Amino acid sequence: MGTASRVTYWCGKLFVYCVAASLPLFAQEPATPALNSRTQSSDTKKNYLVLDIVVTDKSGNAITKVLEEKDFSVLDSGKPEKIIAFRAIAGEALEVQPNDPPVKIILMVDEINTSFSKVGYERIQIAKFLQQNGGKLSHPVSMGYFSDKGIEVDDDSTRDGNVLLASFDQHVTALRSSKESAGFYGTVERFQRSVNALNSLASKESHLPGRKMIIWMSPGWPLLSGPGVDLSYKQRDGMFATIVSASTALRLARITLYSVDPVGVENADSSAGSLYEEFLKPVTVAKKAQAGNLALQVLARQSGGLALRASNDISNQLNRCLADADAYYTLAIDPAPADNAAMYHAVDVKVVPGLIARTRDGYYVQP
């Protein structure tokens, strides 16, 4: 067996082992949010598909007009679906119902995948973000940290950026031991830790009601995809199951994921930062499953969030993410149950002409 063949073989073996252990199939269902009175009847079911939607103009700018249910339509795999629940949340103009709390926002600082040379600048930009407007943030935020210790999230959220900055300054940066010379093995370990961390966070949040926004500050974890990785049919089956689990976990927890790359414009002209775009198309069959389909940026875009990069103004990028909590819409449909193996359903939410609805692009149904 030649060197290239050995690399391909061990890449496939190690990669599939790590991924298969990373994300279990999720059986738990979150409580159905109280969107309006129509969801309170005795026949309320837990398998509603709940969509959190941000509406912008074609340039990506938020709109000030509050839309109504009649302005929305939902297509499930091309078929019109009846909207069974609807709510408009426009900043503080509309009161939040007791059973559907304000959006929960976590700013997650990735200390596993961010190089040591970038940490100092990243910290400066986070401090700038937290101290803007005299330390008064537009929405409550919790600080979170992903390090060798795993996931740590502050118990309390606050709009007081100075309080968050004090917590941030007290946090002891636990950057990973340098594995840059560890070759593939170090890369696989980072991938496994990252996928496990997202799994852990989604599992915890799935038990809590309401919408969550996770802003993950990271260049992303290794894609582990390319000409040197050739998976068998069995390995691709396992990969597909993991992709389905990851997507389902985020959906059940009502998490909209965002990625903000702290590297800045340094790699703006590099194809490495945008390589994830090759994996944005949802995986519908196991034979097309690849590791890149689990990239942070891919999961973010598919969840209805943003993947931001190539800017030195990280504070501004964080504000772009936070703006999604200013005004959004939540609606629910009642999809038909699956009658065979895991099947992907594309979701297309349409609004009035001239506007764009950004939300989850689809979901997997399982028998």
Q: Over which residues does each language-model region extend?
A:
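Small/flexible residues
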Residues: T8, F15, R360-G362
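N-terminal secretory signal peptides that target proteins for export/translocation
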Residues: M1-W10
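Scaffold/interface architecture of coatomer-like assemblies
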Residues: Q28-P367
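Bacterial N-terminal signal peptides
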Residues: G12-P24
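Intrinsic disorder/low-complexity segments
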Residues: A4-S5, A21-S22, Q28, T32
